[in-house]
Structure formats: C-alpha cells, structure tokens
C-alpha cells in the first residue's frame, strides 16, 4: 500500500550533484539540485528559504535557478559570469546551483546554507581528463553551543503563551549555524519557566514580565 509522509519543521538541505568529478577544461558543469527537508529527510514543499552558496577550490558558480518563471532574481548573482558566492530563494522547497570547473586540477567544496537550517557541503574533484574516483562525501558536524533566551511581556494579570520552538545555536565544521527546535515548557513560576528541547541536551529559559503598559497596547 502507498503511504504518505508529511513534512515538519525545515531542518537541512538535501544536495544532489549530477557530477562530482569534472574535467579541468574550464567548461565542465555540475548541476546541484537542493531540496529543503525536515529531520526525517522529507521535502518541505512550501519552503521559501534564502539559500546561500559558497564554493572554494577549483570550481566556480555560474548560475542559480529555482524554476519560478516570474522570479525577478538574477540567474547570475551580481550579474557576473562566475563567482565564489551566490544565493537564491527556494521555490516549492527547491533550488538549483550550477558549478563550472576551472582549468586547473584539484578539489572543490560547495557549502550550502540558510538561516535556521543545518548547512550541507558537496565535495567535487576536478581532474585533467574528467575521470577518476568520486570524492568522499563531505559530512557537516555540529556541537550545541547555546539556546536563545525567550523574553515575553504580557499585560498585568493575563496568562502567557510561550513559543512552541526555540533557537538552538551550534558550532559546526562548516561554520556556526542555528536550528529551530520544539520545546515543552514547565509551569511559569515567579516569572520564569524552563523548557525541555526536543533532541537537545540544553535547557531553554523563559522570562515573563507583567506590565501595565502592555495592557494598553493595541
């Protein structure tokens, strides 16, 4: 029987390159299809994150696209023929980046990132004749660093609704990044609450302030 998987909070980007070994001729292309996915690898079809691309080594970026015909975004970032950086909004959860080899053999590394998503890297190899073993897949690792504190002001005497997610910050092998994670809060006591974060060893902290001024806000 067919089953349908539903996506949840965007977590990272799945990146698939049609080629990971390019010829060092300055014209060989690799098309890297990027998909915003949740923690279970399911596509998030309504994701419209601004996706950022940075490449180092013996390749450059020559184009980005998201399939949205009415988009006013540039196919070539900053209108330059090739660059080491580009960016594009995802459309229906997807975005494409096109890499081109340089004329020198060597390695290349593409880093793909977006706010509140775990970054991903794609390793490529540029060889004299365009053949050879594919490079080892690049794996991004991260270590929890901190949780953004939650501060809420409510009208005096009113109950408070705390956010369902908090921002957890990481130090990673591809640079620092942040993820939004679900949180379950304790009861508010003396204007404070602690949160248990799903999939995290850290604890969230919330401070609730009552204000007569807040009661007059519209």
Residue ranges and their predicted role:
Residues 1-10, 14-24, 37-39, 47-49:
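Carbohydrate-binding surfaces of carbohydrate-active enzymes
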Residues 2-7, 118-127, 216-218:
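Edge beta-strands of extracellular beta-sandwich domains
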Residues 10-14, 53-76, 130-135:
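Short aromatic-acidic-glycine turn motif
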Residues 21-30, 150-160:
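Short, solvent-exposed loop/linker segments at the N-terminal edge
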Residues 27-45, 51, 110-112, 162-172:
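Beta-strand-rich structural segments
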Residues 80-103:
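Short, hydrophobic beta-strand segments
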Residues 173-218:
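Serine/threonine-rich, repeat-prone extracellular segments and beta-strand-based repeat modules
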């Amino acid at each position: 029987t067919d089953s349908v998987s539903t996506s949840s909070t965007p977590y990272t980007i799945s990146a698939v390159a049609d080629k990971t070994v390019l010829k060092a001729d300055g014209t060989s292309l690799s098309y890297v299809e990027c998909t915003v996915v949740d923690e279970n690898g399911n596509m998030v079809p309504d994701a419209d994150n601004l996706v950022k691309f940075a490449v180092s080594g013996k390749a450059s970026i020559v184009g980005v696209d998201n399939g949205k015909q009415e988009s006013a975004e540039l196919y070539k970032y900053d209108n330059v023929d090739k660059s080491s950086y580009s960016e594009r909004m995802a459309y229906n959860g997807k975005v494409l980046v096109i890499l081109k080899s340089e004329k020198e053999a060597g390695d290349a590394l593409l880093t793909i990132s977006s706010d509140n998503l775990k970054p991903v890297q794609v390793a490529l190899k540029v060889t004299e004749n365009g053949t050879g073993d594919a490079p080892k897949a690049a794996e991004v690792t991260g270590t929890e660093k901190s949780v953004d504190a939650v501060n809420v002001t409510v009208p005096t005497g009113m109950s408070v609704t705390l956010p369902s997610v908090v921002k957890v910050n990481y130090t990673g092998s591809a640079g620092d990044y942040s993820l939004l994670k679900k949180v379950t809060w304790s009861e508010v006591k003396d204007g404070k609450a602690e949160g248990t974060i799903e999939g995290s060893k850290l604890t969230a902290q919330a401070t609730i302030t009552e204000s007569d001024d807040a009661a007059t806000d519209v």
